[in-house]
Structure formats: structure tokens, C-alpha cells
Amino acid sequence: MVLSQRQRDELNRAIADYLRSNGYEAAYSVFKKEAELDMNEELDKKYAGLLEKKWTSVIRLQKKVMELESKLNEAKEEFTSGGPLGQKRDPKEWIPRPPEKYALSGHRSPVTRVIFHPVFSVMVSASEDATIKVWDYETGDFERTLKGHTDSVEDISFDHSGKLLASCSADMTIKLWDFQGFECIRTMHGHDHNVSSVAIMPNGDHIVSASRDKTIKMWEVQTGYCVKTFTGHREWVRMVRPNQDGTLIASCSNDQTVRVWVVATKECKAELREHEHVVECISWAPESSYSSISEATGSETKKSGKPGPFLLSGSRDKTIKMWDVSTGMCLMTLVGHDNWVRGVLFHSGGKFILSCADDKTLRVWDYKNKRCMKTLNAHEHFVTSLDFHKTAPYVVTGSVDQTVKVWECR
């Protein structure tokens, strides 16, 4: 590449400035003479630090070029392997594709949870910055911030209509928000430590919460009263999730177990113990996936003629396990993540499992063949949460890198 006379002169002056400002006096004198430079104060100011600036911007551009090349290679690979352009897929087989549709910034601390609204085209994110943010996932627009908690917001949950949002926090409270007026309508106190998980029960009448105080509590939406406490875990309860009809709740804990409770009696129906580290996350299988799970695992159909219920768990032991709750059996273990598994759920088509982890990836698993079929390098830091839209082709992820990303499925 040939430089013009002006470019050559600028480069020489920048080199001369670098040599002089870094104390290479002898080299500076020789170079100045050889390059026939006439240095003066006005010009000196213009070229001060220019060489370093050019150098760092070249490195930045190189990094950007490498990122774009890798995205291009992923797109080529997808095209040749019969991806979205190569063939028409059944929507039940749509999976998230790189690159992300939107990377949304606004939180000032790690994102702890992301969820889709059940009705409108919005999603909600919670963060360690003590706020909850609302975004439009179709346009990528930021809508509003909900403030009220005084410490990290750990989990959020909508009721089935999307009119109510529950949140819980390290400030030891649970808050209920009117999602139409965006106001906090109730604050519930009762846990003695960080409240790490919250879920509105399917009937919409009760909220269930889990805490570092080792308990699970059930609250009445109408009054905010605590009506039940489930005890049994020996350490911090990380997550709690009700099944589809609200008769059972599942919980997971630092005590390395997953427990399933009968809501009506508070009885622990099953204690699932095969993980070798803290269990971070759980997710119930939708009934639409029961037949394909039974087929894939050869699990017995009970006397009632109905398989299931089935449950997924993700752990710091880097594995994902699938359980048959009725027998307490571990049906399979999926191995592939290189760090703590932080989020796991079933694809709405019922054939796949999606997971995210501290290895910065979002993964899609074909559980019938027990293999990871797609790995997306989703974030710059740990991926803390994911959600899959029930009807629209979108996945959302949140990360310690403070961003929320929207992924299109096709």
C-alpha cells in the first residue's frame, strides 16, 4: 500500500512525537534528521499521542472484523446445512439463530431474569441495579422502568392475563405490580433473607416465593397475607415453579436437591438427588411434550394411562437432568455446558430443550438423541436467564454483561 506525500508526512511526525515523548532522544534526533522534519510547537500539539491512538483503533477494528467474520461463517454454515434459507421448517422446529435481533442496553448492573409478557409484544427484565425494565421485543424500544425495590431484583413473574407482575428482591420483599398502570399495589414481608424466586400460581389467586432463609412461602394475592410455609430444604432455595394446574410446586436448592411439593397438603412428594452441586434452575415440561418425552426415554406409562409429569433441572455441576416426578427417576443427563447452568426450559414445540449458562452460551438440545444441536455464543459474560415465547418465534436472554438480547427463531 503506497502512502501519499501528506500521509507520509503525518506518519513521520507522529513517529517523531512518539520517540520524543517516550524518551528516545537519540533515535528522535536521527529520525528527525533523516526524515527532514521541521518540528514546531503548533504542529507538535496536533500529533501528540497520535501514533498510540491509531494503534489502538486498528486493534479495535481488527477485533470487530474478526467478530463479523465469525458471524458470516455461522450464517454460511446455516445456509449450507439446510437452515432457514435452505429449506422451510415446521414452526415446531424453529430454533434461535445468530446474530441476535436486538441487544438492549439500559441496566447498570447484571440482568438477573428476563420474561415475555403473555399477551402483548413486550418483555420484562430484572437486574441487580434494583430496577425492572419493560421493552418492546418487536421494535427493540425501551418502554419504562419500574422502581421500588431497594436491592437486587432476583425474579419476576406474570399472571396468565399479564395484568399483574410479581417481583422479589434481595431486600427481602415481594412486590405486586399493576402492569396496566405500572404501579406497585402491594409489598409482602415475611422472609428473613434474600428472596430469590417468585411465581404467580396458575389460578392467579396466590403467589409462591423461595428464599435464602431455606423456606418456600405462599401468599394470597388479594390480601398479601402469607397462607403457607413449606420447609424441608437444608440450604438456600434458589427457584420455585408451579406446574400447569397449580397442584404441585417444584423447588431447587443449594442443598443439591430438587423437591416437589403437594400444594394442598404441603407434603414433599419427591426429593430428587443426583446433582453434585447447587441446583440453580428448574422447569416443568408442557403436557404437549409428554408423548415425545415418553418415546425418547422409554418411561413407563402409569396405570392412569397418562405419562409424566416431567421436570428439568440445571446445576452448577454443569449438567441438565430430566426427571419423571411420579417415579422420582432421573430419565437423562445432558452434558455439554462448560460452566454453571443458569436457565433451562422446554421449546414450545416440545421436541427441544433450551439452556443458558455461565459459559456465555445459549444451547439447543435434541433430547431424543441426547445431544446439543446448536450452540450460540450469546453474550460477553455469564448468561443468567432465558425465556421462550409461547406463540411468537422469539427467545430472550439476559446476562451479567448488563444487556438483554432478543433472538429470532426460524
UniProtKB/Swiss-Prot annotation:
InterPro entries named among the record's database cross-references: Dynein_regulator_LIS1, G-protein_beta_WD-40_rep, LIS1_N, LisH, PAC1-like_LisH-like_dom, WD40/YVTN_repeat-like_dom_sf, WD40_repeat_CS, WD40_repeat_dom_sf
Domain of life: Eukaryota
WD repeat locations: 106-147, 148-187, 190-229, 232-271, 274-333, 336-377, 378-410
GO CC annotation terms, alphabetical: 1-alkyl-2-acetylglycerophosphocholine esterase complex; centrosome; cytosol; microtubule; microtubule associated complex; nuclear membrane; spindle
Region (Interaction with dynein and dynactin): 83-410
One Pfam family here: LisH_PAC1
Further information: Originally the subunits of the type I platelet-activating factor (PAF) acetylhydrolase was named alpha (PAFAH1B1), beta (PAFAH1B2) and gamma (PAFAH1B3). Now these subunits have been renamed beta (PAFAH1B1), alpha2 (PAFAH1B2) and alpha1 (PAFAH1B3) respectively.
Note on domains (UniProt): Dimerization mediated by the LisH domain may be required to activate dynein.
Protein name (Swiss-Prot/TrEMBL): Platelet-activating factor acetylhydrolase IB subunit beta
